[in-house]
């Protein structure tokens, strides 16, 4: 049965009115899920809802101001600057899961303070079905999944969590966003993880990697925005890698294995494995066969070289673009090489050694690297 946004709003309105009997903070990340949850709640509950966006330092360029301006006709969004607190607390951390957990702790500690400042009792957030399915399956910690994990938010942070979209999938959230009058730039927006660029600085977090990635993200999004892809973004990781003779012989082209690890999914559980880089450019179906062979080892992401940059560089930029119906499974996008080369040519930071393209499906990779 197809999703009916009007029916959903009619059903959720009395539930929200009954549950939320005091002031509520609506946490907005700028992604479609949290923004839709906030606008929906604000429409139903009015001034009881205070929409806030925490600038964690892991947002894209000018993101907080852009989102605030886009939403000004729908709700008043307050931006709270916590950049230094978040970056200094996470700097130097390498493990993907530890980074996500630390981010979650910081995020909810900050929200707890905001809830108290506004004398609120509730936190409205944009958890959707895919989030809690993944987290309960142990694939990765989605920072906004608390109730499903059995975390007592009232005891831990002093607020009750309200999740009006928890039974919806991404395509249904987009339909609801459109129905609620959100700008096209929001409902067609790229999914953006709660921890933002933190989980796209793969491996050790440094300020240098973060700032390079922020600039590169603008370049990648600008060039891929018209291709009708489900999700597309850039990652940065250390270029240190070793040539692997055994794997190279098996797939018939040069393979190197990076020292940086990335998250994947084997069966229904999280796997932490290597990133493999291949040097041969073939048609996408041949590349798919290579990817399938390589991921039968402890490899969770396979990337193919687009262009060498500065030989003295120490970072690799990975471009990831996928198509998917439900974000539970995904296929890599078959982007024209000329477009990928154009992007690589526009990426000019001297610390960048190479630009690569990710050719891994989900599974065995997760869409994000961490």
Curated annotation (Swiss-Prot):
Keywords associated with the record: ATP-binding, GMP biosynthesis, Ligase, Nucleotide-binding, Purine biosynthesis
Task: Specify the pathway.
Answer: Purine metabolism; GMP biosynthesis; GMP from XMP (L-Gln route): step 1/1
EC class name: ligase
UniProt-annotated binding residues for ATP = 29-35
Reaction it catalyzes: XMP + L-glutamine + ATP + H2O = GMP + L-glutamate + AMP + diphosphate + 2 H(+)
Entry's transmembrane regions: none
Name the GO cellular-component terms: cytosol
* Function statement: Catalyzes the synthesis of GMP from XMP.
Subunit structure of this chain's protein = Heterodimer composed of a glutamine amidotransferase subunit (A) and a GMP-binding subunit (B).
- Enumerate the HAMAP family for this protein: GMP_synthase_B
Q: What is this protein called?
A: GMP synthase [glutamine-hydrolyzing] subunit B
- Lineage of the species this protein comes from: Archaea, Thermoproteota, Thermoprotei, Sulfolobales, Sulfolobaceae
Q: Which gene encodes it?
A: guaAB
